[in-house]
């Protein structure tokens, strides 16, 4: 279990400068502020449900699906409920299937692929195989449904948030710690980007910045 948590921390540690919270690190650091203020700003970005808070939303959505889909192996019933979620008629009314889609990855998110492997092993060890395969079915159905409903012409894959909440749950980590664990891992990446910003000593970043 310690190995799985270690892998999760490594996968969340850094993911380039294009994500919202890391870009926040660059923007705030460019003003010349101190490290604590820059990291605090990045934390504010990360906690949002469309960013680092998505793993908690995936977990809550998964519990909602388990309660409302009677036969977890019935793909028709599962598909119909996922459509309700997308049509804002179920779960939190956002129309989002959390943990699906990424700005860069389409075919697969390598972080999710690695975490899924460990999730499967943990689920087998803890007697939660049925739950794992339900999550797996959601993953395989959701991509096509999202593309169809949103009229998108690209593949949509699960991102790292899709399986991280499931892994944390199996490890008996409480929900309120999901996003803080993400932050603990990502601070190393934020600090690296802050150092990069300070070393380059560039102009203050503004909306028209190039």
What does each model-identified segment do?
Residues 1-210:
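Non-transmembrane, aqueous-exposed alpha-helical and coiled segments at domain scale
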């Amino acid at each position: 279990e310690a190995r799985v948590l270690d892998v999760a921390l490594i996968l969340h540690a850094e993911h380039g400068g294009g994500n919202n919270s890391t870009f926040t690190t660059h923007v705030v650091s460019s003003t010349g502020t101190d490290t604590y203020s820059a990291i605090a700003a990045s934390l504010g970005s990360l906690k949002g449900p469309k960013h680092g808070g998505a793993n908690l939303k995936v977990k809550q959505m998964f519990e909602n699906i388990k309660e409302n889909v009677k036969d977890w192996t019935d793909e028709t019933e599962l598909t119909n409920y996922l459509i309700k979620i997308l049509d804002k008629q179920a779960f939190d009314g956002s129309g989002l299937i959390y943990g699906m889609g990424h700005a860069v990855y389409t075919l697969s998110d390598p972080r999710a692929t690695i975490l899924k492997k460990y999730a499967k092993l943990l689920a087998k060890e803890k007697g939660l195989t049925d739950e794992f395969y339900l999550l797996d079915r959601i993953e395989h159905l959701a991509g096509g449904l999202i593309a169809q409903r949103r009229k998108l012409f690209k593949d949509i894959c699960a991102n790292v948030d899709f399986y991280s909440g499931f892994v944390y749950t199996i490890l008996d980590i409480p929900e309120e710690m999901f996003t803080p664990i993400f932050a603990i891992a990502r601070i190393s990446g934020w600090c690296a980007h802050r150092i990069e910003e300070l070393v380059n000593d560039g102009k203050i970043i503004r909306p028209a910045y190039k």
